[in-house]
């Protein structure tokens, strides 16, 4: 079946597409728009529905025709006419022909439409034809009247120089005719009125083929010709026919001046419209003046205006009335600002700038604020183990942590602060292990300052010793409670009663004797009463009600610091308040940076550290000093500025400490210049060891000789240290560090003496003996070979076997060996066994592989370096 589209049906019935689409949808057809297709049966139903509603549609069409009548004034007709000079042939006949042609076209179109729409309804078609004939007769009458009025108007234009009386008479006639025409047309015409269209638009709207339907015009004759707007260069002024390029002046003004005047009026109106909302914005209430003006010297009028809620112009005016000539951006001094505040009746108060570079003060303020905070929670106690050397402090801590730290310490003594955490019944206790040697007095003092409880370890078979007394003094000066642990109760010569009596001399009275000091008899070796000691520590912590606020920015204290070859500056810190996270910007002493990594005491990486937790951090720009304060800042920019300012202040202080010669110190200076000096370059593994060794060496008193530390630092001995020592005729002391290969080669070439130590008091004794000239012939170590670990195997009952390659020299089975990792000496001992291809050998030369074990040491990793040496006797020089 042939199908038709909706728009084709709409064209046949003469109805708009939208109406046909809606009608089709009402009939239940599946259509979407005017492009939808329907079959012949649906077309018949659709046309039949429109035929049934034809009378109503015709009525609507009639009303639409009336509403679309166009009102054309005589002035617009005048505009469309050409000049008599240019066109001598009048267009009246043409207009009549056009009107007749339009009427005939309309009649033909109406007949065709009636023939299509009124099929099957002859009565309705006859009535409609009769109505249209009547309408055409009325339109013809109106056209004739309009042509008559137009003719009279042209007669008026041909004789413009007649007397005024004739003009008035014609004017009266035209007005009366105009009114009659208007009265007749207004009865018929209802619709929009278009007055004074431009000639171009009127020409454009005229039909070229004279086939368009033209409605009855509405003719209006004006009382007097008025000035018309220019259009396409054909102007009419004062009702006279104009000519292009002429009659440019009207009433003494040019058209260009009129155009400029209109443009000026338009711009002025636009400016007024823009200024209206601006006036509404400025209308605002003045805010009340503040009671106090907190100002800074150097503020300008704009800054003050923001603080006191006034416009800067008002402030400038006020200052001008006070005799001060200024502008909005000019800085004002203190007196001027106070004078202005007094004029407004405001109290002026100068802002006090806080020195953010003083992190010690900032540390104290945050500590006090945390104590007053409502968000405090319980924190683990920080316990420092103190006492004399070799009284069992580290052994006790090993018992608590189930480790063996003391077995790997040089000389069996602790030479750095160690921080550890122990868990007991779901509660944590942080322990600090301090050195007991006399050289580490500052370390013990720092340990007492950052701790909550001091555990004083005293050997039951040795009693109170000098460092025991020093530890008591440190604890009392820090106002820290003391718990006495009498150790080595497993020994036959243990006498705890004697120890108690000695401690009572220092006002440490046991609870059994009516005092407030807790005494616990323990044995770190066997574990006797160690749990009782922990219970006493927790009991003391509960009494003290230790709390902290973890929601604040972190503050803490550096326990120890060192320089790692692979990681850079490393600091062991104890967090005291707040929480430290990875990425936080911090200032530590004179250094700054952002936390890169954090490692706990078990060697595990952590992302945050809470109060009372010791961690090892990296990311600082330099190695800080021990006991430096750690303060967290909001952004890295502030931390950098504070750190750089503190470094600059430290440099200035060091320069100020240089003593210049005066009359008062002239004799002392001359006496010192005559003294002999022992220049030393000091390098150690951690900052605390550097401080302890430096202070111990400077305290050596030998008449006529003194120690001069020209340089000290942490890390391995490098080329710059050797160069400095060679230029200063000094020797190098290395404590728990080794020289690099290039530094060692350069030292041999330059003849620089490098002394390496792992026990601090041996270094002190050697320097003292050298200063006194009493250095006896000693044994000197001679390195005979270097090895690199390439593989490791763990064998039960044997230990760790290190598969190594001899890089240099020779390895003997009775030689001593030193384990070096990242330039740090990890262990110094003896070779237990040496094998090659599963056979025991006495020696292995350079370029060969071998397997060896180290006596009492199994912590060997791939990449470790072995330094094999022998002790050779050196005759005194």
Swiss-Prot record:
Annotated GO CC locations: cytosol
UniProt-listed NCBIfam families: IF-2 (TIGR00487), small_GTP (TIGR00231)
Pfam families: EF-G_D2, GTP_EFTU, IF-2, IF2_N
Biased composition (Basic and acidic residues): 78-89, 102-116, 135-155, 162-189
Positions of the UniProt region annotated as G1: 387-394
Molecular functions (GO terms): GTP binding; GTPase activity; translation initiation factor activity
Protein's UniProt name: Translation initiation factor IF-2
Function, in words: One of the essential components for the initiation of protein synthesis. Protects formylmethionyl-tRNA from spontaneous hydrolysis and promotes its binding to the 30S ribosomal subunits. Also involved in the hydrolysis of GTP during the formation of the 70S ribosomal complex.
Originating organism: Lactobacillus acidophilus (strain ATCC 700396 / NCK56 / N2 / NCFM)
Cited HAMAP family: IF_2_B (MF_00100_B)
Classification of source organism: Bacteria, Bacillati, Bacillota, Bacilli, Lactobacillales
Main location: cytoplasm
G2: region residues: 412-416
Residues annotated to bind GTP: 387-394, 433-437, 487-490
Compartments where found: Cytoplasm
All residue ranges annotated as the tr-type G domain in the record: 378-547
Cross-referenced PANTHER family: TR-TYPE G DOMAIN-CONTAINING PROTEIN (PTHR43381:SF5), TRANSLATION INITIATION FACTOR IF-2-RELATED (PTHR43381)
Coiled-coil annotated spans: none
Region named G5: 523-525
Ranges of compositional bias, category Low complexity: 123-132
Bias kind Basic residues: ranges: 92-101, 277-286
